[in-house]
Curated annotation (Swiss-Prot):
Propeptide: 1-2
Keywords recorded for this protein, A-Z: Acetylation, Calvin cycle, Carbon dioxide fixation, Chloroplast, Disulfide bond, Lyase, Magnesium, Metal-binding, Methylation, Monooxygenase, Oxidoreductase, Photorespiration, Photosynthesis, Plastid
Gene behind the chain: rbcL
Name of this chain's protein: Ribulose bisphosphate carboxylase large chain
Gene3D superfamilies: Ribulose bisphosphate carboxylase, large subunit, C-terminal domain, RuBisCO large subunit, N-terminal domain
Species the sequence originates in: Drymophloeus subdistichus (Palm tree)
Lineage of the organism: Eukaryota, Viridiplantae, Streptophyta, Embryophyta, Tracheophyta
Cofactor info, note text: Binds 1 Mg(2+) ion per subunit.
Amino acid sequence: MSPQTETKASVGFKAGVKDYKLTYYTPDYETKDTDILAAFRVTPQPGVPPEEAGAAVAAESSTGTWTTVWTDGLTSLDRYKGRCYHIETVVGEENQYIAYVAYPLDLFEEGSVTNMFTSIVGNVFGFKALRALRLEDLRIPTSYSKTFQGPPHGIQVERDKLNKYGRPLLGCTIKPKLGLSAKNYGRAVYECLRGGLDFTKDDENVNSQPFMRWRDRFLFCTEALYKAQTETGEIKGHYLNATAGTCEEMMKRAVFARELGVPIVMHDYLTGGFTANTSLAHYCRDNGLLLHIHRAMHAVIDRQKNHGMHFRVLAKALRMSGGDHIHAGTVVGKLEGEREMTLGFVDLLRDDFIEKDRSRGIFFTQDWVSMPGVIPVASGGIHVWHMPALTEIFGDDSVLQFGGGTLGHPWGNAPGAVANRVALEACVQARNEGRDLAREGNEIIREASKWSPELAAACEVWKAIKFDSNQ
């Protein structure tokens, strides 16, 4: 053994395994303004104390490993380690705890959501000491959020680009999502936009399949968009999905969309990946394109209540990575979404400063220091009878997206769009006149349907449609 090796191995080093809590559980720690803070829902294995479980999470998501290593002596663990600084019991749940962990900012690469998630959730979720683990929330310090561009444009710039104010925007996903030719697809786009919608949308899995290659779809949709704009005098958009198998191909599609002069493109940010999404967001800001984000695959990550990651974390990550719209559930449609929790992460998307509010699932006060906001998109099983509730819940800075609720109209696509536009305008006018949308919503829709046969037909078709788990 060389003298150098003897020195390294002998000074202050004791080989073996020791409890994580001896190093990583620090209840006296005072968090810094520059720390990234995380709230984990921890379910320890039987016999594992909550302090050890919380410390294990802090260790395995920062500097720790399963045994002591002599190279610990070559750095300052106190400077770089994550710290579990507080643990609280989850009321009403057996053997579940909220473990609060603080991470020094130096652990993370600037401007990289990919690196942030790789560190915090990349490895620890398979840890044997834990029966289940869920990341409930993150506090992003201002010193870190300022290293991100964020959304390409944000809410106010989008309003100005579209010249549309004072109401939610209306959208529609073209159905059937797969199987249409590019020309028939473009026809549906035209009919919906001509009928009064602001946007139409590629579905998340419409990329470039044999029945409809991306370039053909882009061309026919652009033709439809320009024709509808000419006839209505309104600025229209279609979310052209640029998601592809490689980043290079994705960028090629975005470049072609810009050359066509369309206002907006789309990306599946979870299946496409945060690195690809951030690159696309930067391109969109540099080239004047709005960016619509679909959250395909989110329920794989966020649906389980005790394991995975809450969508509010994915929403914060998207605001940092970049997107002007993101799907956010409906509260009232076919997809899951609890009202207060949904409104909590909607505020995290749109607002500049959000106070801690545990009743809405917000574990930390978040200051975005003027990072542009993201417009939430309500989509999934909604129709004209939902319009009052959606207008009241989501407010003006939202996109209300009716796929089947437009294309399923008994008279066709354009009448379906007319029905939705009439219903929305009626709800906005009623709200502005001081009427209570929550209490008078159905009456408002019935009144409007008396002078709109398209709305009356839609009301009749969907009058008894509900998405209850007991059906």
